[in-house]
């Protein structure tokens, strides 16, 4: 990323800008979103074979500025930061997919992103699907949603988790090398941090680890 833009460079090639070249005020591409919560520490996600690049697009033009002090300069200066205070309008996130071969970009058809968190982006081993754990702003209802990578079409919900207090997804899916239809899902749904063996072909909670151990 350069500034708020996202670029891709191949070996011996010039860099290609993925986002629109014109300036979009308050829009950031390819960087961590949602204040780096829910295990989010980056904003780009390469597919297993490098054919596609999924990325976050964060529109924070509707978020108010919060004054921060830059202490890295010799004389401290004020630098505004987009920070939504409790109950105020938060930024809106969408997930894009860049096709390396065609240079085209599509966006996952997730619906209105208002007051939603899009976390733990994962690729299927065959690069055909993208999985996103989506969370409401109240943080008490999470859904594991499957999308078509080539079109962005929403295929459906594989699993959902509710809790009257909160749900906090922290880890992307881990697919089994010997069975690409199976994956490991990490959750605290029973009060402890456990691993669950789940199947892309069957909706359900999965089973694996039980008991009062983490």
Feature roles, as predicted:
Residues 1-5, 10, 42-45, 54-60, ...:
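Beta-strand C-termini and the immediately following turn/loop, strongest in propeller blades
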Residues 1-17, 21-25, 113, 119:
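A conserved hydrophobic secondary-structure block that centers on an alpha-helix together
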Residues 6, 15, 53, 95-97, ...:
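Hydrophobic beta-strand positions in blades of beta-propellers and related beta-sheet-rich domains
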Residues 10-13, 99-103, 149-152, 199-203:
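Short loop/turn segments that connect beta-strands within beta-propeller blades
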Residues 14-23, 106-109, 154-160, 205-211:
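Beta-propeller fold detector
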Residues 18-45, 55-107:
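Predominantly five- to eight-bladed beta-propeller fold
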Residues 24-40, 113-118, 163-171, 214:
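Short glycine-/Asp-/Thr-/Trp-enriched loop segments that recur within the blades
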Residues 31-48, 94, 120-122, 169-181:
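Signature of short aromatic-glycine-proline-rich micro-motifs recurring in repeat-based ectodomains
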């Amino acid at each position: 990323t350069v500034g708020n833009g996202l670029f891709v460079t191949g070996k011996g090639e010039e860099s290609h800008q993925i986002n629109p070249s014109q300036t979009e005020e308050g829009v950031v591409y390819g960087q961590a979103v949602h204040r780096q919560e829910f295990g989010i520490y980056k904003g780009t996600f390469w597919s297993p074979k490098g054919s596609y690049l999924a990325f976050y697009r964060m529109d924070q033009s509707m978020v108010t500025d919060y004054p921060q002090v830059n202490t890295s300069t010799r004389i401290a200066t004020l630098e505004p930061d987009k920070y939504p205070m409790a109950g105020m309008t938060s930024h809106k996130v969408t997930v894009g997919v860049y096709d390396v071969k065609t240079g085209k970009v599509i966006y996952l058809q997730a619906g209105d992103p208002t007051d939603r968190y899009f976390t733990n982006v994962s690729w299927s081993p065959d690069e055909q699907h993208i999985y996103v754990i989506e969370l409401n702003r109240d943080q008490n209802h999470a859904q594991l949603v499957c999308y078509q990578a080539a079109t962005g079409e929403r295929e459906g919900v594989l699993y959902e988790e509710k809790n009257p207090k909160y749900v906090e997804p922290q880890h992307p899916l881990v697919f089994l090398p010997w069975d690409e239809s199976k994956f490991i899902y990490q959750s605290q749904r029973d009060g402890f941090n456990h691993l669950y063996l789940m199947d892309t072909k069957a909706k359900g909670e999965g089973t694996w680890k039980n008991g009062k151990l983490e």
